Amino acid sequence: MSQAIDSAAADFELLASLRRGEGGALMALAERYGSMIYRLAFGVTRNQADAEEVLQDVLLTLARKGESFEGRSALGSWIYRVTTNAALNKRRGKRREVEVSIEEHLPTFEADGHRSGDRTYLLADWSQDPERTALAGETRRVLEQGLDALPPHYRAILVLRDVEDLSNEQVAEVIGDSVASVKSRLHRARMALREQLTRHMAQP
């Protein structure tokens, strides 16, 4: 509890420094949140150069708009929101073509792991085989390909939930969507990645 209070106090002081225009405030912001911003930006854009540009854009946005932060949510939540929007906009700027609807290229699965409409296809259950789930170099490559294939909005939810460890409610607040929608998209994104790995593991 005390750590959370200390963190909130540090954020409050950092924000106050930004509003006062103090020279070291932006550097302090970068040191405190830079890694988080880059991690999320890369998770959405899947491109190092784009993620670095998003990082710079977000830091400048925070420096310019620090006065508009009303404190209704944690500073970190606000930064997540700014970063997610910036990363998604970066992707939209690079891909003008209309993306295929997620329903057309992401499979759906039943709770027992079977693909909807196909009882012969069952996702591998790795929970009882920890050695098999270890991400070796080749398997990691397959996972990266699966992430690349996800629409950016789904990647954003996946990174916020599974990498940044936000709750479903926090993710919904960041992206401006309902909790039910977050849960649905998160499930489909996870299942798509799991199917990608299942296919790879099944290869001789």
Q: Which residues are covered by each model-predicted region?
A:
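Short, charged helix-capping/linker segments at alpha-helix termini
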Residues: 2-5, 19-28, 38-57, 156, ...
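Amphipathic, Lys/Arg- and hydrophobic-enriched alpha-helical face
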Residues: 30-48, 65, 80, 147, ...
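Short, Lys/Arg-enriched C-terminal cap helix and immediately downstream tail that follows
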Residues: 70-71, 92-95, 150, 155, ...
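N-terminal module of bacterial RNA polymerase sigma factors
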Residues: 1-36, 43, 122-132, 148, ...
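Sigma70-family region 2
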Residues: 19-20, 46, 57-74, 92-95
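Helix-turn-helix DNA-binding module
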Residues: 141-181
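Arg/Lys-rich amphipathic alpha helix in sigma70-family domain 2
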Residues: 67-71, 84-102, 108-113, 136, ...
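Structural recognition of an alpha-helix C-terminal capping motif at a helix-to-coil junction
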Residues: 39, 53-60, 73-85
